[in-house]
Structure formats: structure tokens, C-alpha cells
């Protein structure tokens, strides 16, 4: 115990001798400072210069690759947006969600469909499901029906060029710059394509889910959500500083749910309610 106590006291003494802000610099630090001011530390050895060149080359590569990614993604996104605008007439006709509005103010819920689901509940129990439906997105109040633009239109800010010192300064750096910029460019194009595909998949999922809900609604398999209106001819707010005339407040009073099987009403149609 006495030995441990001595060790602790020694450590305490050691840490107590550490310099803190406000103390004088030790002689070693003063010497380094003086030599740096006089310029006596600039005589680099060959190995030191090579190390500095390697560090700069690595920085040049990173800068070129990063800039290439940004420029590639920006270029490809502009291409995609241009193609979408050129085909806007067809898209406006193809992707129409106004038919999924209830009372012109509420967007229908979406329904997910899964086939041949197998669920293993431990070693002694399992379940095989031929078909399942799940209410996914709840109904929501909207000012207008969403369009394809809400899903697919994306803007990217124009990338900023690298700072002057980041550009290559010799043939070795120029060669590395070219390779890394091209590699980054195509990586950026790939990223822009993935972003667009993700947006497209999201739109397809939502539109398909809306059609599926309407198909189930036609058979009374699901209930229709209810939109409530609370109308006030005059409403005074902010201690009399604001007045609303003909104010209408919309609220979703009842969400959708699946009906009992006994309430289902099979409908024979030509597929108009279950369009894909």
C-alpha cells in the first residue's frame, strides 16, 4: 500500500511540473522559435522534399476526384432534367394523381402488396401467406394533386472550382489530376443515375399503391378516409391584429382500415380501377 501511495505521489508531482498557458517557454521551444523566425529551418533534406511532394500529390488527387464527382453528378442531373422537360407532355398524361383526391383536398392512402410470404417464428412455428395487403402511407391533406415533378425534379448547385493552389503544377501532378478527375466524373454520373432511379422507384411505389387502394376500395375491402371541414365566416387572431374571412379548416377525422370479410363486395371489371 505504501508503494502504491508513493507512485501516486510521484505521478502527481510529475503532472504538477507540466507547463501551462502563461508560463515561460522551455529552452528547446525558444530555440525552435528563434530558428523558425531566422529561416534556419527551411533547409529540407531530399527525403523531406520527397515526402512533401507525395503529400501534395495525394492532396491533388483527392481534389481532382472530389471535383470530378461534383461536376459529373451536376452534368448528368442536368441531362436527366432536360430529358424530363422534353417529355413533360407525355409524363403529364401518364402520371396523373388528381383522380386519387377525395373531396379535392385529401390524397388517398397507399397500399403495399406482397405475395408468397413465409415467416419463420422459431424452430417450432412458421407461417406461409399467399397474399398480403398493408396500408402504407396514410391519407394526407394537400393543396393540389402531386405530379411527377414532385418526385423527379431535382436541382443541383453548380460546383465550385478548386482553389488556385489545388491545381497541378507539374507533369506528374497533371497526369494524376486527369486520371482522378475522370474517375470522379464517372462516379458522379453513376451517383446521379442512382438518385434518379431512387426517385423513380419512389414515384412508382406511391402511384401503384394509390391504384391498389382504389381497387380495394371498389370492393369495399378498405374504408374510405373521412375529411372534416370546420368553417368560420369570420375569425379574429393575434389579439385583434389579424382577421380571417370565410376560414375553412380541414382535418382528417377518420383514417382507412380493412373491413371484415363479410363486408367485402367483389367487383367484376375490366381493370380500370386497378390500372398499372
Question: What is each of the regions a protein language model found here?
Answer:
Residues 1-9:
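Bacterial N-terminal signal peptides that target proteins for export
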Residues 104-276:
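Mature extracytoplasmic/lumenal regions of exported proteins
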